[in-house]
Amino acid sequence: MQSLEQCVNSLEAIVHQLDGSVSRLARNGEASNELCEGILKIKRVFELVPEYDVESARLALFEEVDPMVKTLGDKIEKALIRKRRELENLRQTSELNSLRLSGDLYFSETGIDNQDMDVSTDAIAIASATDAELDELRALKARRAELQELLDGR
């Protein structure tokens, strides 16, 4: 309340000072009296607003903005979920491609024709696999590589 009183006092002081400036200009510039009256008129463009009106306007603004913010937050959350799913699918695709590449390397090194193997369902199986299944697949792949090294070493 004290700052409001300070604002009112400051505005009154400004109005008083402007009144004095206009009256001095009117006295000193009798020839340009029309200019002083037309351009230098004092216009009061401020008024005091009750605190109740300020609070009700603030509440109305919150009521208008809050639903928009919540809607935007929901949209962002859904987009994040979609992007996480897309990232997981890309990781699984990358894993599948690396498995295929390592399989192609194995077949090229051993000279075995990999055309006989049907891997057409591998993409579906790995794309729909869970993390635990992918971990098990990695472990089996590592075990297969170890066994192959043992066979190659003999």
From Swiss-Prot:
Entry keyword Metal-binding: no
Predominant location: nucleus
Cellular component, GO annotation: cytoplasm; DASH complex; spindle microtubule
Localization: Nucleus; Cytoplasm, Cytoskeleton, Spindle; Chromosome, Centromere, Kinetochore
Domain of life: Eukaryota
Annotated InterPro entries: DASH_Spc19
Claim: Cytoplasm is one of the keywords in the record: yes
MF terms (GO), sorted A to Z: microtubule plus-end binding
Keyword vocabulary terms for this entry: Cell cycle, Cell division, Centromere, Chromosome, Chromosome partition, Coiled coil, Cytoplasm, Cytoskeleton, Kinetochore, Microtubule, Mitosis, Nucleus
GO biological processes: attachment of spindle microtubules to kinetochore; cell division; mitotic sister chromatid biorientation; positive regulation of attachment of spindle microtubules to kinetochore; positive regulation of microtubule polymerization; protein transport along microtubule to mitotic spindle pole body
Coiled-coil annotated spans: 72-96, 127-154
PANTHER family hit by this protein: DASH COMPLEX SUBUNIT SPC19
Similarity remark: Belongs to the DASH complex SPC19 family.
Subunit structure as annotated in this protein's UniProt entry: Component of the DASH complex consisting of ASK1, DAD1, DAD2, DAD3, DAD4, DAM1, DUO1, HSK3, SPC19 and SPC34, with a stoichiometry of one copy of each subunit per complex. Multiple DASH complexes oligomerize to form a ring that encircles spindle microtubules and organizes the rod-like NDC80 complexes of the outer kinetochore. DASH complex oligomerization strengthens microtubule attachments. On cytoplasmic microtubules, DASH complexes appear to form patches instead of rings.
Function: Component of the DASH complex that connects microtubules with kinetochores and couples microtubule depolymerisation to chromosome movement; it is involved in retrieving kinetochores to the spindle poles before their re-orientation on the spindle in early mitosis and allows microtubule depolymerization to pull chromosomes apart and resist detachment during anaphase.
Protein name: DASH complex subunit SPC19
